[in-house]
Amino acid sequence: MADIGTTGRIPLWLVGTVAGTAAIGLLGIFFYGSYVGLGSSL
């Protein structure tokens, strides 16, 4: 867990992890919403 060169900044791996998790979560919510909305008629 060496943050050499990232003093005073957020580590890039942390930004990538948070952004990736948020993106996957949002996509999951959208897919789940469309699945529930359309799944009732299928």
From Swiss-Prot:
Pfam families per record: PsbJ
Instruction: Give the source's domain of life in one word.
Output: Eukaryota
What's any one GO cellular component for it? chloroplast thylakoid membrane
Q: How does it sit in the membrane?
A: Single-pass membrane protein
- Looking at the UniProt entry, the stretches that span the membrane are 10-30
Subcellular compartments: Plastid, Chloroplast thylakoid membrane
What NCBIfam families does the record point to?
A: PRK02565.1
- What is said about its interaction partners and assembly? PSII is composed of 1 copy each of membrane proteins PsbA, PsbB, PsbC, PsbD, PsbE, PsbF, PsbH, PsbI, PsbJ, PsbK, PsbL, PsbM, PsbT, PsbX, PsbY, PsbZ, Psb30/Ycf12, at least 3 peripheral proteins of the oxygen-evolving complex and a large number of cofactors. It forms dimeric complexes.
Q: Which PANTHER family match?
A: PHOTOSYSTEM II REACTION CENTER PROTEIN J (PTHR34812:SF3)
* Family the entry assigns: Belongs to the PsbJ family.
Protein name, per record: Photosystem II reaction center protein J
Organismal lineage? Eukaryota, Viridiplantae, Chlorophyta, core chlorophytes, Chlorophyceae
